[in-house]
Amino acid sequence: MAELWSAISAALPVTEAEFPLDFSEKVEPSVVDVLKRCRQQLYTGSGRWRQNAQIILDFSWEKLNTGTWRDVDKEWRCLYSYGCLFKVAALCRDDASPATVQEAIRTCDLGLLMGAAIMDNILQTFVKILQNEIRKRHSNEENLSEGVSAKKMKVDCVSVPVVKQALAVPRIHCPSLESFKKDYLDPQKPVILEGIIDHWPAFKNHPWSIEYLQTVAGCRTVPVEVGSRYTDEEWSQTLLTVNEFIDRYIVVKDASSLGYLAQHQLFDQVPELKDDIRIPDYCCLGEGEEDDITINAWFGPGGTVSPLHQDPQQNFLAQVVGRKYIRLYSPEDTEKLYPHQLQLLHNTSQVEVESPDVVRFPEFVKAPYLECVLQPGEVLFIPVKHWHYVRSLELSFSVSFWWS
């Protein structure tokens, strides 16, 4: 316990006076007083430390869940992160049992997911310390939630479409920046790029597998979509550790439902995985900076579906594990694709692409499209606003790069 607390305290400012607590007038003085008490207790080790941290968490949680997420002031997200910081420190000082360490990691993850970066992203530093503590206590086999190799994996019984050659997305091997810009980016034409990610550590140094993902990220808490597609009425979201997600939705346990770790910035949360990938060179043709590129993870079993939709940026979809069937439609044919009228889903089609209701949506069958089965090691360029439908054919891990 002393060793863990020593590592945690070493990540903190040396003195209380150096510990920053700078908030605007939006944060009530009474709340700032609780923060200051937590800071004092952090350095003296006395008082109702953990209870005060929970007060901050409860107060800021209400602020985070008032109105729409985009309108939440950054001050409240920072406040939530401070609450997580103080709670983690209290947990690690009082107790260092395996359950407590896991609770501390979950608290850090909630701060990383819901809060804002504070003090040079100190919560990420805490996670590294806590993960090292777990790895010291357990061998990889003990840490792999019973060991995936000993379990029966969910069998993916999904249909594999036959891609018609006339409708196939064109393919090109390692085009130059100039030729990609001239032939595909400028005219906004989809294309599959081959041979541009073969050098990724995710393929070479430590190929991504269930076991590897559990080793580097098994104890991390992530958002999971539950349901076959986000337009379904029974669709929902929940928070699970990666180990729990794999146990519940990758390994046979509840074959009646699908879980999908979808459109999540996992690589900001787990830097070890970010080290396994590289931003495609072609992103330099955009107008934004590298920091403006949004990198998302898409991990789930066969049968997961992203309904026909469009994105507001250029997209490189890199396939690392498994295969995906993808169909693309030009934005010029938007009217034939019957977008939802609701503002929340205006970028999503009402049509079930592979089993369309031709009575309700008669024009859909007249819309031309391209299609492909994206294989591991391939990258699909999806031009901005191009409609695309995606279905996993088996256990799959994809990485998307949104850029302008």
Swiss-Prot record:
Into which EC class is this enzyme placed? oxidoreductase
Reaction(s) catalyzed by this protein? N(6),N(6)-dimethyl-L-lysyl(36)-[histone H3] + 2 2-oxoglutarate + 2 O2 = L-lysyl(36)-[histone H3] + 2 formaldehyde + 2 succinate + 2 CO2
SMART domains associated with the record: JmjC
GO CC list: nucleus
Q: What terms describe the molecular function in GO for this protein?
A: chromatin binding; histone H3K36 demethylase activity; histone H3K36me/H3K36me2 demethylase activity; metal ion binding
Binding of Fe cation occurs at: H309, D311, H388
Q: Where in or outside the cell is it found? A: Nucleus
Its cofactor is:
Fe(2+)
Answer yes or no on keyword Oxidoreductase.
Answer: yes
Q: Where is the JmjC domain?
A: 268-404
Q: Which Pfam families match?
A: ARM_KDM8_N, Cupin_8
Please name the InterPro entries in this protein's record: ARM_KDM8_N (IPR056520), Cupin_8 (IPR041667), JmjC_dom (IPR003347)
Q: Which residues form the signal peptide?
A: none
Q: Describe cofactor binding as the record notes it.
A: Binds 1 Fe(2+) ion per subunit.
What EC number(s) has UniProt assigned to this enzyme? 1.14.11.27
- Keywords, ordered alphabetically: Biological rhythms, Cell cycle, Chromatin regulator, Dioxygenase, Iron, Metal-binding, Nucleus, Oxidoreductase, Transcription, Transcription regulation
Under what name is this protein listed? Lysine-specific demethylase 8
A GO BP entry: G2/M transition of mitotic cell cycle
Q: Which SUPFAM superfamilies does the UniProt entry name for this protein? A: Clavaminate synthase-like (SSF51197)
Q: What does this protein do?
A: Histone demethylase required for G2/M phase cell cycle progression. Specifically demethylates dimethylated 'Lys-36' (H3K36me2) of histone H3, an epigenetic repressive mark, thereby acting as a transcription activator. May play a role in the regulation of the circadian clock.
Annotated organism of origin: Salmo salar (Atlantic salmon)
